[in-house]
Curated annotation (Swiss-Prot):
<keyword id="KW-0217">Developmental protein</keyword>
<dbReference type="GO" id="GO:0005125">
    <property type="term" value="F:cytokine activity"/>
</dbReference>
<comment type="similarity">
    <text>Belongs to the Wnt family.</text>
</comment>
<feature type="short sequence motif" description="Microbody targeting signal">
    <location>
        <begin position="121"/>
        <end position="123"/>
    </location>
</feature>
<dbReference type="InterPro" id="IPR005817">
    <property type="entry name" value="Wnt"/>
</dbReference>
<comment type="function">
    <text>Ligand for members of the frizzled family of seven transmembrane receptors. Probable developmental protein. May be a signaling molecule which affects the development of discrete regions of tissues. Is likely to signal over only few cell diameters.</text>
</comment>
<dbReference type="Pfam" id="PF00110">
    <property type="entry name" value="wnt"/>
</dbReference>
<dbReference type="GO" id="GO:0005615">
    <property type="term" value="C:extracellular space"/>
</dbReference>
<dbReference type="InterPro" id="IPR043158">
    <property type="entry name" value="Wnt_C"/>
</dbReference>
<dbReference type="GO" id="GO:0046330">
    <property type="term" value="P:positive regulation of JNK cascade"/>
</dbReference>
<keyword id="KW-0449">Lipoprotein</keyword>
<dbReference type="GO" id="GO:0030182">
    <property type="term" value="P:neuron differentiation"/>
</dbReference>
<keyword id="KW-0964">Secreted</keyword>
<dbReference type="GO" id="GO:0045165">
    <property type="term" value="P:cell fate commitment"/>
</dbReference>
<keyword id="KW-0879">Wnt signaling pathway</keyword>
<dbReference type="GO" id="GO:0005109">
    <property type="term" value="F:frizzled binding"/>
</dbReference>
<protein>
    <recommendedName>
        <fullName>Protein Wnt-7(I)</fullName>
    </recommendedName>
</protein>
Length: 123
C-alpha cells in the first residue's frame, strides 16, 4: 500500500472587469512626473513625481504620465481629435454616450423626433 500526495499550483488572471476597475482607479490617481538627469548631456536617470513643493520617486505600482492628454472636447487637428461639439448624445445615459460627459459641461439642446414608416403589416 502506497500513498501519493500531489500538489499543483498555478497562477490565474483576475476577471477582466476587475482589471478594468483597478486600471480606472490607477488612472484617476495618476501623477505627473519629470525626468531627472545626472548631468545636462545625459539621458534621464529616473523620474520624480512633482507635487507642489515636494519630489519623490514613483513606486513600481504608481501610474505616471509625462505629458497631459489633449482636450478631447475641443477639435484639435494636430492630435486628430474632432471634438464633441455637434455630436448626438443620449440624455439618459450615465456613460460616455451621455450628454453630461460628452458635452463637456457646455450644455446641450434636446430635440424630439417623430419618425413614421411603413411596416408592411398584413391583416
Amino acid at each position: 500500500s502506497g500513498s501519493c500526495a500531489t500538489k499543483t499550483c498555478w497562477m490565474m488572471l483576475p476577471k477582466f472587469r476587475e482589471v478594468g476597475y483597478a486600471l480606472k482607479d490607477k488612472y484617476s490617481e495618476a501623477e505627473y512626473v519629470e525626468p531627472v538627469r545626472a548631468s545636462r548631456y545625459r539621458r534621464p536617470v529616473f523620474l520624480k513625481i512633482k507635487k507642489s513643493s515636494t519630489y519623490r520617486k514613483p513606486m513600481d505600482t504608481d501610474l505616471v504620465y509625462i505629458m497631459n492628454s489633449p482636450n478631447y472636447c475641443e477639435e484639435d487637428p494636430v492630435s486628430g481629435s474632432v471634438g464633441t461639439r455637434g455630436r448626438l448624445c443620449n440624455r439618459t445615459s450615465p456613460g460616455a454616450a451621455g450628454c453630461d460627459l460628452m458635452c463637456c459641461g457646455r450644455g446641450y439642446n434636446t430635440h424630439q423626433y417623430k419618425k413614421m414608416w411603413q411596416c408592411n403589416c398584413k391583416f
